A protein has these predicted regions:
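Residues within helix-turn-helix
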Residues: 29, 127, 138
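Arg/Lys-rich amphipathic alpha helix in sigma70-family domain 2
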Residues: 60-80
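A short pre-motif secondary-structure segment
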Residues: 115-119
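Acidic, proline/glycine-rich intrinsically disordered inter-domain spacer in sigma factors
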Residues: 72, 81-106
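A short, charge-rich alpha-helical start-of-domain segment used by transcription regulators
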Residues: 1-19, 23, 29-32
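DNA-recognition helix of helix-turn-helix
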Residues: 133-157
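The alpha-helix within a helix-turn-helix
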Residues: 130
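Structural recognition of an alpha-helix C-terminal capping motif at a helix-to-coil junction
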Residues: 19, 33-40, 44, 52-64
């Protein structure tokens, strides 16, 4: 990988990688750290990463770093209001809906949450997710099925309350 190819990867994937880390950790600083560490590892291993597999490599590294941080209990517990913005007048409050979805996702086990985010937010295939997480493709499908079932249950419980 040349410097120009690396720069192209940074411009192409940094935003998606950042969103993935931010949704998982809910900390701007930690998300930036994850992105920086992921790209650092890509550069350090540039000779071993196959051409065309850079995105998969970056998300695999980010996923593993996120899992490590969650296991160590370093989830963000500060003021989340810094991540919120007010909707423009006359526009629906999509941020409120986004926060609600984030809360629902937070109720899932970390692995299920990460897989849902990789599949539904980032558009990865089951095969790509299996490679990233070192699970079989069948296991990935089962975890996603369980996560979606749990989300339906959670949303159903909310509807009964409302």
């Amino acid at each position: 990988m040349t410097g120009a190819e690396y720069d192209k990867c940074v411009s192409q994937y940094s935003d998606n990688l950042y969103r993935f880390a931010l949704k998982s950790l809910r900390s701007d600083d930690e998300a930036k750290d994850i992105v920086q560490e992921s790209f650092l590892r890509l550069w350090e291993n540039r000779e071993a990463v196959l051409s065309g597999k850079e995105k998969s490599y970056l998300f695999t590294v980010a996923y593993r770093l996120i899992v490590d941080r969650v296991r160590m209990g370093k989830r963000y517990t500060g003021d989340e209001s810094v991540l919120r913005t007010s909707p423009a007048p006359g526009r629906p409050d999509y941020n409120g809906i986004s926060e609600l979805i984030d809360r629902f996702l937070d109720e899932l086990p970390p692995l299920q949450k990460s897989l849902i985010m990789l599949r539904d937010y980032e558009g990865y295939s089951y095969r790509e997710m299996a490679e990233m997480t070192r699970l079989s493709e069948t296991q990935v499908k089962v975890y996603i099925f369980r996560a979606r079932t749990a989300l339906r249950r959670i949303i159903g419980d909310i509807n009964n309350i409302l």
